[in-house]
A protein has these predicted regions:
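Hydrophobic, aromatic-rich transmembrane alpha-helices
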Residues: 352, 357-379
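Multi-pass, polyprenyl lipid-linked donor-dependent membrane glycosyltransferases
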Residues: 16, 89-99, 116-127, 131-150, ...
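Signature aromatic-anchored transmembrane alpha helix within multi-pass, membrane-resident enzymes
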Residues: 188, 268-271, 373, 377-378, ...
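Transmembrane alpha-helix segments characteristic
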Residues: 121, 365-367, 376-397, 546-550
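Interfacial juxtamembrane loops and adjacent helix segments
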Residues: 30, 34-93, 290-342
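Short hydrophobic alpha-helices at membrane interfaces in multi-pass membrane enzymes
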Residues: 158-174, 255-261, 388-389
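C-terminal luminal/periplasmic domains and tails of membrane-associated envelope-modifying transferases
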Residues: 227, 249, 253, 337, ...
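Membrane-interface transmembrane helices that cradle and orient dolichyl/undecaprenyl
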Residues: 110, 151-166, 198-201
Length: 565
């Protein structure tokens, strides 16, 4: 997995979001300002800044007049920096985090399903094309999902040692919230589970009364007479001791009250620790918390607005949420199964997951979820895995931006644990089937190396056909400029080249001498025409004219198509 991710990180040029995150990370460390990329909390970008600290990055102008996207391009291409080195430096901490999350997957699944279950879960996580693809990039999706997953694992561990693990769960939850606000819907579930874990721990520590078949602990030795018979204790003494003992009902009520108070304290304490972590992250960027609410920022009102107002987080965090709500009010274009559309499709994300998840993994996810539900002793563990997966998926399905399975990147973590429980099914054919499905996942993942971002499973034609069904970060996120430059230099030297590119990279930096076909009449566009597949998916009328007389002859990274016209 490490080899696959490092190879991917070295080969890919900037995706659409990465320059913004890198520039913001540098502004954090150089200027201690929160003004860029406020729609996302700072922690993920501070993690990237840890990698950038090993590079000699030039000083950014505090008065730079451009947008955050322009600042990202300026940092990578206009400031004398090496974009390959900067990107790799920012991506390496994310890669290390992704590998560490794999160990958490192993530990969680081993706790629930034993060593074999842990290995099954680790194998599914390690071969997940989505995890490899997005864990190789300087983005926020995998860090946020992994930190939240770690929080749920620690809450699970808290069932046995609450005073050690529940505070750590609060730290992990706060870190997740300080990376992406989209983790907020999981907070009620986690604090309730913290209370449940404390309840279980307190109940397990209470002494259990002896049953009729069990003698009391340390029964008193009876004195014997010279004839060997026991002297019975005086009846009056026994009655007095019984009268002095508290009633059984009072003892039970006292124990229950203690458990309730401890559970409530665990829930509140875990939440307060998470809140403190978010504040500490913002203070780490700017100890003075200098922030001005942008003009014209709409307030949603209603329950959503009330929830934002009541969040115990810095104003910059709450305003970032309002910016996200503003973005959700827009109408976006989407592309699914070969058809473009405008607006929102509630089933887009489940359909995209079915396309981009290995078939064996889908089968094991489903089997694992059913196993956790139908095996009684696993139902408690299911509370720590399945509800959070369902809640986050349902919330993601309501979003207006149909841009990729990265919005559900938490599923390969949580459902890997569920899949590991199939190891507890002691049926010969089930064990053989599980082994074959894991092997199928591994083969499918290895076959797509190193093109993990545009992966799709065999039922939908494999990686080469992903662009026929999906777009944007599912297949073409602007990541293949370096591969395109090499392809043009090797296979099409000296030919007239035209380029329609979607991304944040600068083609000229990579030696791509291509003209813009939109600047001349259609009948003057002849030669090699390179088009990002995301542009083809949502082709404008002008682009459709260009494609009418164009013949596809080649592809680059399964994200760009080369035509001859």
């Amino acid at each position: 997995m490490a080899f696959a991710m490092v190879t991917t990180a070295v080969q890919l040029t900037p995706t659409i979001d990465e320059p913004v995150y890198l520039a913001t990370a540098e502004v954090y460390t150089q200027q201690h300002s929160l003004r860029y990329n406020p729609e996302h909390p700072p922690l993920g970008k501070l993690i990237m800044a840890a990698g950038l600290a090993f590079e000699d990055v030039g000083e950014l102008d505090p008065a730079y007049p451009g947008s955050q996207s322009a600042l990202g391009r300026h940092l990578l291409y206009e400031s004398g920096n090496n974009p390959f080195r900067l990107l790799l430096a920012a991506r390496m901490p994310i890669i290390l985090l992704t590998l560490l999350f794999g160990l958490v997957v192993l530990a969680f699944a081993r706790d629930v399903a034993g060593p074999v279950g842990g290995l099954i879960a680790l194998a599914l996580y390690s071969f997940s094309p989505d995890v490899i693809a997005h864990g190789s990039l300087a983005t926020l999706d995998v860090p946020a999902a992994g930190l939240l997953f770690t929080a749920f694992w620690l809450v699970w561990r808290g069932r046995n040692r609450p005073y050690r693990y529940l505070p750590l769960a609060g730290l992990a939850l706060g870190a997740a919230l300080a990376t992406r606000a989209s983790m907020l819907p999981a907070v009620p579930l986690l604090v309730l589970l913290a209370a449940l874990s404390m309840w279980h721990a307190q109940r397990a520590r209470e002494p259990q009364p002896p049953t009729a078949s069990e003698p009391a602990d340390n029964p008193p030795l009876e004195e014997t007479t010279e004839e060997g018979t026991a002297d019975a204790p005086p009846k009056e003494t026994t009655e007095e001791s019984t009268a002095d003992a508290p009633p059984k009902e009072t003892t039970v009520r006292s124990a229950t009250t203690k458990r309730l108070l401890s559970s409530a304290a665990a829930a509140v304490g875990t939440g307060l620790i998470a809140v403190a972590v978010v504040w500490i992250v913002y203070l780490a960027v700017d100890p003075h918390l200098r922030w001005t609410t942008p003009a014209g920022l709409p307030h949603p009102g209603g329950l959503k607005g009330l929830a934002v107002d009541w969040l115990p987080f810095p104003q910059a965090y709450r305003d970032g949420l309002l910016m996200q709500f503003k973005l959700e009010l827009r109408t976006y274009n989407g592309f699914l199964l070969g058809h473009g559309y405008k607006g929102h499709l509630w089933f887009y994300l489940p359909a995209a997951l079915v396309i981009k998840t290995p078939l064996g993994m889908l089968a094991l996810w489903a089997a694992g979820a059913l196993t956790m539900i139908f095996i009684p002793r696993l139902r408690v563990a299911a509370l720590y895995v399945l509800p959070v997966s369902a809640v986050l998926l349902l919330v993601a399905m309501t979003g207006s931006r149909s841009y990729g399975t990265r919005y559900a990147i938490f599923l390969p973590l949580f459902l890997a644990v569920a899949a590991g429980t199939v190891a507890l099914v002691r049926i010969r054919w089930a064990q053989v089937t599980t082994a074959l499905l894991v092997l199928f996942v591994a083969v499918s993942s290895l076959r797509t190396f190193p093109y993990y971002l545009p992966y799709s499973n065999e039922a939908f034609g494999g990686t080469a056909d992903t662009h026929l069904n999906l777009h944007d970060s599912n297949v073409d996120w602007g990541q293949d400029l370096a591969r395109l430059a090499q392809k043009l230099k090797t296979d099409y030297p000296g030919e007239q080249t035209w380029l329609v590119y979607k991304g944040s990279g600068v083609p000229a930096y990579y030696g791509i001498a291509a003209a813009d076909p939109y600047t001349v009449p259609v009948d003057q566009v002849h030669g090699i025409l390179v088009i990002s597949d995301s542009r083809v998916a949502l082709a404008s009328a002008r682009l459709r004219q260009l494609l009418t007389d164009a013949t596809p002859i080649d592809q680059v990274g399964y994200s760009m198509t080369i035509y001859r016209r």
